[in-house]
């Protein structure tokens, strides 16, 4: 019971050490990834992993829950305070599980769901045909304007009036602009639909007051905790009190069994951090960094190489890059940046002609680097490395760019001293 991981399972210990090295020495720019604080890692690696706690605080189906009840209540209260919500459920294991529970609570199988088309930046759980949301419900979709790549709310309204959905989802996985939540609310009211906002990507910006909050407009709001919120991988739900009973029942027993109390403890810690001035400063640097990258990728030397930025910029933490006129496709561009020490993900652009495993675009995010401490100076350097790689293509001097990326990474140490307290230690 007391032997360290390196002794019990040296194979896993070695892989953890290698992954720590990768995270330290490269620039993480996948928009949905971040670095959980040490305090969150400690909470999630705690003895709470041993505790079963089916039910809600004060209404458990197991004994011995006096301490985990307090943990969950702290997490719920912090979520409500942070987002100005009437109720919170912090038990969903993920953002996808949160969406499943909300739809379970608000709809019945066969009823109509309207969401952003996956090909235009939507998420799998917003009606993709192979996902549960595409199998259980009848789906309609809205998209972006082919010319501006922006969501046209008049078009959304026209679609909603024709389709008459039971639930409208406002949210995205790859859309670089702020949504008009008031307009979505108006449309939902006009057609008699409930409004679910999926703020998984921009919840941290909302918490910092740097992005409009969907909470006053939505019936229910779902989110992850690990993207811009910067906690551990998990989900939560906030919203109006009138939906609390239905959503609590949809989470348990509708979708899940026992909650992961160690993960809920990590959520509580992350939510406490998200209420601090330091967190707000990190979100400001996240936004500024994304704008710096977008501006650099729209410069003439990059545009000449056939690279463009979807919608002509960004309002959030990510930049969506269009490579349709470039010699590079999304896979090739992802691989090239990987070689120079920058991790991004290939991503479809609106109405992408290439298959999903190749794509014609990149999604580039700034949250993880802002968490490391990057500011405008560092983001300007990162932007130039990316721009040089994409504009030059396969003939670029990979070694020179990798040296620049590595110097940046090592200037901002990540998890300094982690080996001394973690199970990875030798």
Curated annotation (Swiss-Prot):
Reaction(s) this enzyme catalyzes, per UniProt: (6R)-5,10-methylene-5,6,7,8-tetrahydrofolate + glycine + H2O = (6S)-5,6,7,8-tetrahydrofolate + L-serine
Cofactor: pyridoxal 5'-phosphate
Pathway(s): One-carbon metabolism; tetrahydrofolate interconversion; Amino-acid biosynthesis; glycine biosynthesis; glycine from L-serine: step 1/1
GO molecular function, one term: glycine hydroxymethyltransferase activity
Positions that bind (6S)-5,6,7,8-tetrahydrofolate: 118, 122-124
Subcellular location: Cytoplasm
E.C. designation(s): 2.1.2.1
SUPFAM superfamilies noted in UniProt: PLP-dependent transferases
Main enzyme class: transferase
Transmembrane segments: none
Modified residues (N6-(pyridoxal phosphate)lysine): 227
InterPro entries reported for this sequence: PyrdxlP-dep_Trfase, PyrdxlP-dep_Trfase_major, PyrdxlP-dep_Trfase_small, Ser_HO-MeTrfase, Ser_HO-MeTrfase-like, Ser_HO-MeTrfase_PLP_BS, SHMT-like_dom
Cellular component GO terms held in the UniProt record: cytosol
GO terms, biological process: glycine biosynthetic process from serine; tetrahydrofolate interconversion
Swiss-Prot/TrEMBL keywords: Amino-acid biosynthesis, Cytoplasm, One-carbon metabolism, Pyridoxal phosphate, Transferase
One Pfam short name: SHMT
Annotated positions for site Plays an important role in substrate specificity: 226
Stored Gene3D superfamilies: Aspartate Aminotransferase, domain 1, Type I PLP-dependent aspartate aminotransferase-like (Major domain)
Family assignment from sequence similarity: Belongs to the SHMT family.
SUBUNIT field: Homodimer.
Role: Catalyzes the reversible interconversion of serine and glycine with tetrahydrofolate (THF) serving as the one-carbon carrier. This reaction serves as the major source of one-carbon groups required for the biosynthesis of purines, thymidylate, methionine, and other important biomolecules. Also exhibits THF-independent aldolase activity toward beta-hydroxyamino acids, producing glycine and aldehydes, via a retro-aldol mechanism.
HAMAP family the record matches: SHMT
Protein name as it appears in the record: Serine hydroxymethyltransferase 1
Organism field: Mycobacterium bovis (strain ATCC BAA-935 / AF2122/97)
């Amino acid at each position: 019971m007391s032997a360290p991981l390196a002794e019990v399972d040296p194979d896993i210990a070695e892989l953890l050490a290698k992954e720590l090295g990768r995270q330290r020495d490269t620039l993480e720019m996948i928009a949905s990834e971040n670095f959980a604080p040490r305090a969150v890692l400690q909470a999630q690696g705690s003895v709470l992993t041993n505790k079963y706690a089916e039910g809600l605080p004060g209404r458990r189906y197991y004994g011995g829950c006096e301490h985990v009840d307090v943990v969950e209540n702290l997490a719920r209260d912090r979520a409500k305070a942070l987002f100005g919500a009437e109720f919170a459920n912090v038990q969903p294991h993920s953002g996808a599980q949160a969406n499943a529970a909300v739809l379970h609570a608000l709809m019945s199988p066969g009823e109509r769901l309207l969401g952003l088309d996956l090909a235009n930046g939507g998420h799998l759980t917003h009606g993709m045909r192979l996902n549960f949301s595409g199998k259980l419900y009848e789906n309609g979709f809205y998209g972006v304007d082919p010319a501006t790549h922006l969501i046209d709310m008049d078009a959304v309204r026209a679609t909603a009036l024709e389709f008459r959905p039971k639930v409208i989802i406002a949210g995205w996985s790859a859309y670089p602009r702020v949504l008009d939540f008031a307009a979505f609310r108006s449309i939902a009211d006009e057609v008699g639909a409930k409004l679910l906002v999926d703020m998984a990507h921009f919840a941290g910006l909302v918490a910092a007051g740097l992005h409009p909050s969907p909470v006053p407009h939505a019936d229910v709001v779902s989110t992850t905790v690990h993207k811009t919120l910067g906690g551990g991988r998990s989900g939560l739900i906030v919203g109006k009190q009138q939906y609390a009973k239905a959503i609590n029942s949809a989470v348990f027993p509708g979708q899940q069994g026992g909650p992961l109390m160690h993960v809920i403890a990590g959520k509580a810690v992350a939510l406490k951090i998200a209420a601090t001035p330091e967190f707000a400063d990190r979100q400001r640097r996240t936004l500024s960094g994304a704008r710096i990258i977008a501006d650099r990728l729209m410069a003439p030397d990059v545009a000449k190489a056939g690279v463009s930025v979807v919608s002509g910029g960004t309002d959030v933490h990510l930049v969506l890059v269009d490579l349709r006129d470039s010699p590079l496709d999304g896979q090739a561009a992802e691989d090239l940046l990987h070689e120079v020490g920058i991790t991004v993900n290939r991503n479809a652009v609106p109405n992408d002609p290439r298959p999903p495993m190749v794509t014609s675009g990149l999604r580039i995010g700034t949250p993880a680097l802002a968490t490391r401490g990057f500011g405008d100076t560092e983001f300007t350097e990162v932007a130039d490395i990316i721009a040089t790689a994409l504009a030059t293509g396969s003939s670029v001097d990979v070694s020179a760019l990798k040296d620049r990326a590595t110097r940046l990474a090592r200037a901002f140490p990540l998890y300094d001293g982690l080996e001394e307290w973690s199970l990875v230690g030798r």
